[in-house]
């Protein structure tokens, strides 16, 4: 009496031993081993390569935009400069850019409106934050801001819509700014710090694309100039070369891994496993 064909159902009682291996699986594995010994001729399309480079650049630009939060905070908290002039200048630039764009007016208006609501709400709550922060040690503030920063970068990098920040990333940004603003001395400093961070990380990214050549140049000049002043030119050069390595070399390594290893590792699962659930 012939046995029924083996099925890939672990919960089904079958007339096969527990260590049974299907012959088709063995043939597939042998064929893949033979192919792995040959020179790989798989290639990625130019569009796929360009998308990989763009993803690396987008993440790098996200790091730059996030670093503006700490640059602004250091400008106000450590150096004690007046935050009103840069706030007015940045607000003027934001207003000009928003008027020159041809995006739907209603959507842009809603983005600005929601950001302003958050700003004035935080301005109202800033005295409360100041009173609460008196009982909080600075080490706790720095630790909390560090983890909020990592969380913010992770969320905004994994957002599918790159032209509009998600609600979660906006809330994390507001929480991060609220934590840092508790160290500032006056309500005006808190308001200006919050307004600058919201414009740089919420409003302006909705208008400016990462492919814009002017924005990355200005961002890099500001960030590396600040690093030169704050850390010195040696550390600035180390960070600069690490950034160049990340933008130029790592994408090539990732493309090489994508061509030679990634598909090969997933061939077995994608071919053998069912694409849709198999029911009894």
UniProtKB/Swiss-Prot annotation:
Its EC number is: 2.4.1.198
Catalysed reaction, written as an equation: a 1,2-diacyl-sn-glycero-3-phospho-(1D-myo-inositol) + UDP-N-acetyl-alpha-D-glucosamine = a 6-(N-acetyl-alpha-D-glucosaminyl)-1-(1,2-diacyl-sn-glycero-3-phospho)-1D-myo-inositol + UDP + H(+)
Checking InterPro entries in the record gives:
Plno_GlcNAc_GPI2 (IPR009450)
Gene Ontology cellular component list:
endoplasmic reticulum; endoplasmic reticulum membrane; glycosylphosphatidylinositol-N-acetylglucosaminyltransferase (GPI-GnT) complex
Q: Name one GO biological process term.
A: fungal-type cell wall organization
The UniProt entry lists membrane topology as: Multi-pass membrane protein
Grouped into one coarse class, the protein's main location is membrane
Coiled-coil spans are none
- Where are the Extracellular topological domains? 75, 130-135, 211-220
User: Quaternary arrangement and interactors, per the entry?
Assistant: Component of the phosphatidylinositol N-acetylglucosaminyltransferase (GPI-GlcNAc transferase) complex composed of at least GPI1, GPI2, GPI3, GPI15, GPI19 and ERI1. Interacts with ERI1.
**Entry protein name:** Phosphatidylinositol N-acetylglucosaminyltransferase GPI2 subunit
Q: What is the lineage of its organism?
A: Eukaryota, Fungi, Dikarya, Ascomycota, Saccharomycotina
